[in-house]
From Swiss-Prot:
Catalyzes the transfer of the phosphoribosyl group of 5-phosphorylribose-1-pyrophosphate (PRPP) to anthranilate to yield N-(5'-phosphoribosyl)-anthranilate (PRA). PANTHER family: ANTHRANILATE PHOSPHORIBOSYLTRANSFERASE. NCBIfam families: trpD. Homodimer. GO terms for molecular function: anthranilate phosphoribosyltransferase activity; magnesium ion binding. This is Anthranilate phosphoribosyltransferase. It comes from Methanococcoides burtonii (strain DSM 6242 / NBRC 107633 / OCM 468 / ACE-M).
């Protein structure tokens, strides 16, 4: 570890191989003092795409990986978090809608660190058993087309980073590694980031990690495609990274206000998700639809995100998305769900029977 620290002190970048090895030491043998010094030294220098790709590889080397056997491409909708608008759980709802539209979804997520409700929190509120063993998540993806991977279950080595991260209390490279370390090795992803300046960096990293089709975006303070204003996108496709912006008008949805999509506790966000899947129209549905459309697009089921929007809408209006959520709850919990709760937007965590 001393070698890597000295390189940072001297202002030198690490190679991808060095970064991978450094992450291995961080997760296995480095002291808390060494970890803190390394992380802050890297933050002050600024991470390169080679370094971040190496860190991701180092994490994946010790992860509990799974390889679902599926037709087509696996897609993840995991973002970095850091939403300044405290919205509903958009990427969680989008994952369900995309799965109902025919996308095979390997959803990587965690409990909330930056908001009231993370993907794990709202899934738990809905009745999904979130801490399945890896082999059961693999079966979920293969059998029903969607699975949820709770990050600590698949990245147990990261447990030793909880203390140092809390003590540092600033954003570091670990805030962006979650979406880069999907335990299935999903080749297609839609990733929202908390800072526009991260879009191209993340796209470059994902290219180096061998991804095939990725959209990395930031919209008006959100790690989502925004319906409040324009969204900046870095898209990786066929080995080429391109930049462009998306507006609500281009996507055919109404421009919303921040108050229209505000979320709350896991229970409140679970209610909102069920209202959307039961067909309730409005700004919350619109932002879920455009983000689900992005997942449908990178999966290759539509030629553009705009062309994917009707597929997302149909998945909701036909109740396929609601039924997909029921499948996920029943598969993971082993219990039948309360249909009345699903159809009225009640919390399901205590309603499975």
């Amino acid at each position: 570890m001393k070698y890597y620290l000295q390189k940072l002190i001297d202002g030198h970048d690490l190679s991808m191989v060095e970064s991978e090895a450094a992450m291995g030491q961080i997760l296995e043998s480095a002291t808390d003092a060494q970890v803190g010094a390394f992380v802050m030294g890297m933050k002050m220098k600024g991470e390169t795409s080679d370094e971040v790709a190496g860190f991701a590889k180092g994490m994946l080397n010790v992860a509990n990986m799974i390889r679902p056997k599926v037709d087509g491409i696996l897609v993840d909708t995991c973002g970095t978090g850091g939403d300044r608008h405290n919205t509903i759980n958009i990427s969680t709802a989008a994952a369900i809608v995309a799965a109902a539209a025919g996308v095979t979804v390997a959803k990587h997520g965690n409990h909330s660190f930056t908001s009231l409700s993370g993907s794990a929190d709202v899934f738990k509120e809905l009745g999904v058993k979130i801490d399945l063993e890896p082999d059961l998540v693999k079966s979920s993806i293969e059998d029903i087309g969607i699975g949820f991977m709770l990050a600590p279950k698949f990245h147990p080595a990261m447990k030793r980073m909880v203390g140092p991260r809390k003590e540092l209390a600033v954003r570091t490279m670990f805030n962006i590694l979650g979406p880069l370390t999907n335990p299935t090795g999903a080749k297609a992803q839609v990733i929202g980031v908390f800072d526009k300046d991260l879009c191209n960096l993340m796209a470059e990293v994902l290219k180096k990690l061998g991804k095939e089709h990725v959209m990395v975006f930031h919209g008006d303070g959100m790690d989502e495609i925004s319906t409040l204003s324009e969204t900046f996108v870095a898209e990786l496709k066929d080995g080429i990274i391109s930049n462009y912006t998306l507006t609500p008008e281009e996507l055919g949805v109404a421009r919303a206000k921040a108050t229209d999509i505000v979320g709350g506790t896991p229970e409140e966000n679970a209610h909102d998700l069920l209202y959307i899947l039961n067909g309730e129209k409005g700004a919350k549905r619109d932002i879920v639809v455009v983000n689900a459309a992005a997942a449908i697009y990178v999966a290759g089921l539509a030629i553009s995100i705009k062309d994917a929007i009707p597929l997302a809408e149909e998945a909701i209006d036909s109740r396929k998305a609601l039924n997909k959520l029921k499948e996920l709850v029943e598969f993971t919990s082993g219990n039948k769900v309360d249909n009345e709760a699903f159809n009225t937007g009640q919390s399901l965590r205590n309603e499975v029977c």
